């Protein structure tokens, strides 16, 4: 509802964030339609943001080649605005992992179709992207885990074992993490709220700065992303 009002005001933020919400909910058709409305507006959303979300949606729809082109656009396309703002998304290991995963999807699809040449090509492309991630973040769990799959399918067992052990070494201790997290979340309610993957910020609440204690409680959801993209 909040994003619908933003869209009515003529801002691309409205349909763009609606697309993000729909995507998080698994409504891919709704996400596609909302994103199309966003890119049709003037001004348009940043091209790298719309390309990233388009890639996410396309991958979930099984359009892996489309996803690859969109993720490559985020990482490599140079635009006047991007250069002016000095954005370098080539260091964004989240998007690079997504690109590698899309290549891996293509490799698995080629394998199912008994296309060995295509399978090997896409496995090597996936390998390249995941190894680039490790030059940025040597402890990246997603890259190590996916490289296990890549090397297993390439038949290079020693490399698969190397990344298997690295994944075990760098994987957080979930039990220890939960023991530390629960008391902290109970002690700091505001931090607990902000730590959720989808954060619901109360627009009006008792005790809020500038509002009377009897202020009615209203809320709107804002989805947060661990990503360099705005």
Model-derived regions, located:
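Structural marker of alpha-solenoid helical repeat scaffolds
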Residues: 7-9, 41-43, 77, 88, ...
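TPR/TPR-like (Sel1-like) alpha-helical repeat modules
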Residues: 71-76, 141, 148-176
């Amino acid at each position: 509802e909040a994003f619908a009002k933003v869209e009515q005001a003529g801002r691309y933020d409205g349909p763009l964030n609606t697309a993000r919400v729909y995507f998080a909910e698994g409504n891919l058709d709704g996400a596609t339609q909302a994103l199309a409305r966003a890119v049709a507006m003037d001004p348009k959303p940043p091209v790298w943001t719309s390309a990233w979300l388009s890639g996410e949606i396309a991958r979930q729809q099984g359009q892996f080649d489309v996803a690859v082109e969109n993720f490559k656009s985020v990482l490599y396309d140079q635009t006047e605005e991007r250069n002016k703002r000095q954005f370098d998304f080539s260091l964004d290991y989240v998007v690079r992992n997504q690109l590698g995963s899309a290549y891996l999807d293509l490799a698995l699809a080629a394998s199912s179709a008994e296309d060995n040449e295509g399978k090997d090509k896409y496995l090597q492309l996936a390998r390249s992207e995941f190894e680039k991630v490790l030059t940025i973040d040597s402890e990246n769990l997603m890259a190590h885990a996916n490289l296990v799959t890549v090397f297993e399918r390439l038949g290079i067992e020693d490399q698969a074992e190397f990344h298997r052990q690295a994944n075990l070494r760098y994987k957080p201790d979930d039990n220890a993490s939960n023991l530390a997290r629960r008391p902290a979340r109970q002690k700091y309610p505001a931090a607990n709220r902000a730590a959720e993957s989808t954060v619901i910020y109360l627009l009006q609440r008792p005790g809020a700065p500038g509002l009377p204690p009897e202020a009615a409680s209203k809320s709107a959801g804002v989805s947060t992303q661990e990503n360099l993209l705005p």
